[in-house]
């Protein structure tokens, strides 16, 4: 069984209604990974990858490439890439807090912000231009969409 970026986002939306911090932390983390996978898929459709600025980690590298799009990208596409990179960077900061800084509080408000950022990433990835972001419906053999 495989999952999609949208599946992670759906889990986050459900957990948003939980009444305890551990679940908010899980939801914040999954929302980031939803955006990460959505962004990674979207980036593959660009004419050429951006400059990773020598970053080594896969997360930092993706964010850097999105923030520094290649000149082969037309202006609107480059602008969208930078927006996605900015939102993903903000989400990563919140995800690190949720996953690793257990001595810091994670609030429902922080989770709401994380979900807002995820919605912005998904919206930009689905915008006009370089195709669309990951489909919310996976294709089964024979081309029938799975709902």
What are these regions (language model features)?
Residues 1-147:
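Terminal alpha-helical segments
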């Amino acid at each position: 069984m495989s999952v999609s970026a949208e599946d992670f986002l759906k889990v986050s939306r459900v957990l948003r209604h939980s009444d305890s911090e551990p679940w908010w932390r899980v939801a914040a983390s999954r929302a980031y990974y939803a955006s990460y996978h959505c962004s990674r898929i979207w980036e593959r459709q660009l004419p050429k990858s951006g400059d990773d600025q020598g970053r080594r980690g896969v997360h930092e590298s993706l964010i850097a490439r999105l923030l520094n799009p290649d000149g082969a990208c037309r202006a609107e596409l480059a602008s969208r890439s930078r927006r996605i990179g900015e939102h993903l960077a903000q989400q990563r900061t919140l995800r690190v807090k949720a996953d690793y800084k257990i001595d810091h509080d994670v609030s429902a408000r922080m989770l709401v912000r994380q979900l807002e950022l995820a919605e912005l990433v998904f919206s930009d990835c689905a915008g006009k231009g370089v195709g669309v972001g990951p489909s919310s419906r996976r294709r089964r053999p024979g081309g029938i969409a799975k709902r």
